[in-house]
Amino acid sequence: MKNLCKISDDYLNSKLKYLKLLSKQYPSISKASTEIINLEAILNLPKGTEHFITDVHGEYEPFVHVLKNGSGVIKRKIEELFSNTIRDSEKKMLATLVYYPEQKLDLIIKQEENIDDFYRINIYRLIELCKYASSKYTRSKVRKLLPENFKYIIEELLHEHVKSEHKEEYYKSIVETIVDIGIAKEFIIAISTVIQKLVVDRLHVIGDIYDRGPRPDIIVDKLIEHHCVDIQWGNHDILWMGAASGEKTCIANALRISARYANLDIVEDIYGINLLPLATFAIEMYKDDPCKEFIPKVNDQSVTTTEKSLMAKMHKAISIIQFKLEGEVIRRRPEFEMEHRLLLNMINYDEGTINLKGKTYKLKDTYLPTIDKKDPYKLTMEERNVIDKLVSSFRGSEKLQKHVSFLFSKGSIYLKANSNLLIHGCVPLNEDGSFMSMNIMGKEYKGKALMDKMESLAREGFFFKDKAEEKLYGMDIMWYLWTGKCSSLFGKDDMTTFERYFIAEKETHKENKNPYFKLRENEMACKRLFEEFDLELDESHIINGHVPVESKNGESPIKANGKILVIDGGFSRAYQKTTGIAGYTLIYNSRTLQLVSHEPFNSAEEAIANESDILSTTVVVEHKAKRKMVRDTDEGIKIQEEIEDLKLLLMAYKKGLIKEM
C-alpha cells in the first residue's frame, strides 16, 4: 500500500475520475471512514472454510448429501458444541435435521407425541449451532445469507449476548411465538439452510459434473443456487458445453455415452432434445441387426428388452456418425495432429478386418451399411439430416443453454485460489518434464499459455454468433479438449473409442496417460509447475481430480510430499470397485487442510429415516500454528486495494478536490 503522506497531487489528480465515481458510493468523509473501519475489521477475521469436490459424474444423491453435510463439518461442529450435553442419538438426529430439515420433520411430526416440545428444544439447539457456525463472520456477511421471511428473527436470536432477565424473556417469547403461531417447521427449515451455507464459505467443483450418472442437471441446479461456487471444467463437462454450442462431434459423443449407459432420459425428458429422428433412423437402418456390441450397460430391471434393443440401435447409429464427424474435424485441423485416429479408411470392408500399427485385427461387428468404403467419412443424406436436427435441438434447449452458460460464467480450465492451483486433469508435459506444446493458428503455445488460449477459444465457440470461422474453430477446440493429447482435461495420448467397440484384443484399447501423472509424484517437477503458475512453493498445492485414486491397492491421494492432492476416488458407483471407497473431498479452513475419504452413500431416503450419514475418515494434511486470516487470502488482497482507494478518496475530500455531498 502506498504511503498516503507521500502521495503527490499529480498522482491524486490522475485518479480523480475514478475517485469521483467512488464518491457516489461513499459521498462523505464519515461514510468513507466507516467503510475503511469495516474492511480493516474483516481483514482480521479467520479465513472462511473452502470445500473441494470433484468427479461427481451425475451422481446427484451423494453429491447433494456431501454438500449438505460439508464433508462432515456440520457433524464435527455439533460434536464440539454439544459434546457432553446431549446424547449421541440426539446429535445424529440434529445432524439429519440440518441436512434434510423438511423431509426429517415430515417423519418426526408423524412419530412425535408432543411436537411443540420437540420444536422448542431443537430451535434452541439450532440457534446455538448457527451462532457457533457464524462466529468467524461479520454480521453483514451472515445477514446476506439469511432468508427474507426470517431475517429479523434469526438476527435477533443470533446476536443475543446480554444476559439479563428481560433479554432472556424477550428471546424466550420469540421462540414461544414461533411455535404458537405454527411456523416452527418453516423456521427450522430456514435456519438449517443457513447453517449449511455458513459451514462452507466457498465451494470448488473441480470438474466432471456430467458423465454416466443419472441427473447432472440436478447438480447444476444446486450449484446455481449456491451462495459462492466456482467450477474447473472436466472433460465430460466440456463435451456437453461443446454440444450446447452446436459442435456436431460433441453432440454425437454426448449421445453415444448417454445411450451406452441407458441414460437418454436426461437428454430427452430433462433437456427436451428430440431424439425421434435418431430413433427412427436407427430402427430403419439397423432393423435386423442385434447391435450386440452396443447393448447398453444397465442394471435397472425396469428397462425392458425392447427398450434395450432400441437403445442399442440408437447407440450404434450415433457411434458411426461420431466416427465420421471426427474424421471431418481431424482433416479440417491438421494442427491437431490426430491423423492416426482416422481409422475408417484402415478397414478392409471385404474381409472385415482393420490394420493398426502394422497388425491386422478382426472386427467384432462388420455390419456397417452407412459406410461407403470409397469415402468412409462421408455422411449419408439420412445421417446428415439426423445430426442437423440434433444440432438444432441442442442449441434450442433452454435448460441446457442455461446450464452451460452457468458453467462458462462460473467456470474455467484452471483456477488459482488462495495459493492453490485447481485443475481437473493435468498440465500437459513431455517425458522429460518440459511443457507439451501445440501449434494454434500458426503460433506455439505451452503450459499456462496453452491452457489460457484453449479456454479463450472455447468461449468464442460458445458465445460468438456472427463470426462463423472463429466460432467453428472454438467449437473444434472444445472437441479437442475432450479427446486431444495436449488437452489438460483429457490427459491421455489417445481416446480408443472405436477399438473398444470393434476390436476384441485389449492391447488396442490402451490409452497412455500424460507423463504429468507419473511426474506429479516428484517434488522437483511440482516446483516447475508452481513457477509456471506463479505459486509459492512453501504455501501452495495443486489439487486434481480426473484419475480415480485406487485406495484399496494402497495408492495415496497425497503426492510429492503433500504438494499435490488428488481428490477423485469414486462418486461414480462404476469406479467404486476400482477405488474401494466413494471418493475424496478436501476441506481448507483457517488452521488446517483436511483430506476426507468417504464410504459409499446408499440413499437420501435411508439417511433421513435411519439418521445414517456417509462414513468419512479425515486426515489432516497440514496444520498451521498461526491461523490464516482474511488478510492472507485473495479476497484480502482485493479488500486491501479497496481500502487504499478509500484512503485516496478521503485525501481528495480533505484537499477539496472532491466535495462532500
Curated annotation (Swiss-Prot):
By its UniProt entry, which Pfam families does this protein fall under?
A: FBPase_2 (PF06874)
By its UniProt entry, which InterPro entries does this protein fall under? FBPtase_class3, Metallo-depent_PP-like
Arranged from A to Z, the UniProt key words for this protein are: Carbohydrate metabolism, Hydrolase, Manganese
UniProt entry tagged with the keyword Manganese: yes
Needed co-factor(s): Mn(2+)
GO molecular function per UniProt: fructose 1,6-bisphosphate 1-phosphatase activity
The pathway this protein participates in, as annotated, is:
Carbohydrate biosynthesis; gluconeogenesis
Question: Which region is the signal sequence?
Answer: none
EC number(s) per UniProt? 3.1.3.11
Q: Has the keyword Hydrolase been applied to this entry?
A: yes
Catalyzed reaction equations: beta-D-fructose 1,6-bisphosphate + H2O = beta-D-fructose 6-phosphate + phosphate
Q: What is this protein called?
A: Fructose-1,6-bisphosphatase class 3
State the organism of origin. Answer: Clostridioides difficile (strain 630)
Q: Which gene encodes it?
A: fbp
